[in-house]
Every structure is written in C-alpha cells, then in structure tokens.
UniProtKB/Swiss-Prot annotation:
InterPro entries: DNA_glyclase/AP_lyase_DNA-bd, DNA_glyclase_Znf_dom_DNA_BS, Formamido-pyr_DNA_Glyclase, FPG_cat, MutM-like_N-ter, Ribosomal_uS13-like_H2TH, Znf_DNA_glyclase/AP_lyase, Znf_FPG/IleRS. It comes from the Bacteria. PROSITE patterns: FPG_CAT, ZF_FPG_1, ZF_FPG_2. It comes from Aromatoleum aromaticum (strain DSM 19018 / LMG 30748 / EbN1). Keywords: DNA damage, DNA repair, DNA-binding, Glycosidase, Hydrolase, Lyase, Metal-binding, Multifunctional enzyme, Zinc, Zinc-finger. GO terms for biological process: base-excision repair. The active site is at P2 (schiff-base intermediate with dna), E3 (proton donor), K58 (proton donor), R260 (proton donor). This is Formamidopyrimidine-DNA glycosylase.
C-alpha cells in the first residue's frame, strides 16, 4: 500500500503540473472503487480551477473553489499526469482532464477512493479524526511519551494507529523501529522518553530518506511523473526474513503483529 512517502511524492509530482489549471473534462470509466465515485462529480467540477494540491496522512486533496476532491490510492493505486489522448488501460479508472493533459488514477485492486467534499477537505469525516503528521513539528518525543502513557499495545501497532500518528504504514514502521533499535512487540507505554525521542527521530529519518529515494515500488507504485521508487533497495529489515542483518549479520526475523508481517533483528532490537 502506498504510505506517507509515496503519497507525498505523488503530491509533489503532480502539484506543479496541474495546480492553477482549469478542469476541462472528467471521465470516470469505472466508478466502483472502495466507495462509488460520485455520479455528479463532472457536473460539479468541469470548468472549475484547481487551486492547489496537498496531502493529509495518506490522502491527497485536490482543492477547488467550493470544495476538495479526496483521493486515496488504496492498496495498489497511483496518480500521474499523462497526455489526455494516451489510451487508458484496464485499470485506469478516473481521468481529470486539464486541456491536453490528464491526471489519471490507476488502481488495479480498486481499493482506492475518489470523493467530493464541499468546503475544506480537512473537515471530511475520514480526515477530521486523524492523528499527528510525523514530519511536522508537533510530532516530538515528549508528545509521543504522553500519547503512549499507559498504552499496552505494541509500539509497532501504536505507530500504525492513524488516530495517533498518520502515514507510518507497515513498511516504514518496521524500518523506523530498526533504526531506533526498539523491538516491535515492546508495549508502547513501557518505553522511556529517551528511547521514544530516538524513535521519533528515526521515523522522520526513514520517511525523509524514502521520499528522497522516490518511495518504495514493490508492485505497482509510480510517482506523479511515472517513475518507480527505489527505497526498497535500502531496507534494513522489511521483507528480509532469514537474510543477514545489514548491521550485525544476525538473520532477520518475521513476526505477525496485528495481522501484519513485521520484520526485525533479534540482536539489534532486543526486548
């Protein structure tokens, strides 16, 4: 699933290409995504100017004068700018057309979202209750220590709880915990403030490194310019079960936490 880095890369990639332009057409080839694409979306938006593109958690917000289109890439989606006359593939479900170019949603598993919200998109129910952005100033060790006080849930699950912290999905949670030398099964409330401060720094470091590398392309992800990411080549633990730890050569282990595969080094990340 595209996580925060992939969505941020998409946002940065498409923003300069479409922001400020007028929507000339909107084509929905298959409205059956996780929720149906609104049937009147074209009627609402064609002729309107796209004022800006921003990210909140794993959502993209396409801001128009009277509201926002919310886009979620689901498990396998990508959003990129193509020539408007480029033939659509079987998994290309939605085009927002700006003259000679189109912003095209490709979603093989159709688990993404394209929704309309009148007014500020941040007030949409899917976004209003989300937690802190890990790349913003409010995400600190002191805040995380307070937010996890008394929490018995594992630190891995806590990092992936979008009501606390957004965008740190399965891949980057495993990678961040390795960099911080924290065992993924450690109860969040039992981790001291110094180690949590180190974890906050590791989360930021991991996410920024992934953004610099164009994100992770394990299957379908490409950025707004159509390029694949290569951060997967830098993974310390994710997907490396049985392979030697890049730091100490101990075999990397896999454990299922909250129904998600989690990877760690038993030597570098002692309980």
């Amino acid at each position: 699933m595209p996580e925060l880095p992939e969505v941020e890369i998409t946002c940065r990639g498409i923003r300069p290409l479409v922001a400020g332009r007028t929507l000339t057409a909107l084509e929905v080839r298959n409205p059956r995504l996780r929720q149906p694409v609104p049937a009147d979306l074209a009627q609402t938006l064609v002729g309107e100017r796209l004022q800006g593109v921003r990210r909140r958690a794993k959502y993209l917000l396409l801001d128009f004068p009277h509201g926002s289109v919310l886009v979620h890439l689901g498990m396998s989606g990508s959003l990129r700018v193509v020539s408007a006359d480029e033939p659509a593939g079987v998994h290309d479900h939605v085009d927002l057309v700006f003259g000679a170019e189109a912003l095209r949603l490709r979603d093989p598993r159709r688990f993404g979202l394209v929704l309309w919200h009148a007014g500020d998109g941040l007030s949409h129910p899917l976004l209003a209750a989300l937690g802190r952005e890990p790349l913003e100033r409010g995400f600190t060790g002191a805040w995380l220590h307070e937010a996890t006080r008394g929490v018995r849930l594992s630190i891995k699950q806590t990092l992936m709880d979008a009501h606390r912290v957004v965008g740190v999905g399965n891949i980057y949670a495993s990678e961040s915990l390795f960099r911080a030398r924290i065992h993924p099964l450690a109860p969040a409330g039992a981790i001291g403030p110094q180690r949590l401060a180190r974890l906050v720094a590791s989360v930021r470091e991991t996410l920024l490194a992934a953004i610099d590398a164009g994100g992770s392309t394990l299957r379908d992800f490409v950025g707004g310019d159509g390029r694949a990411g290569y951060f997967q080549q830098q993974y310390f633990v994710y997907g490396r079960e049985g392979l030697a730890c890049r730091v100490c050569a101990t075999p990397v282990r896999r454990v299922v936490i909250g129904q998600r595969s989690t990877f760690f080094c038993p030597r570098c990340q002692r309980r």
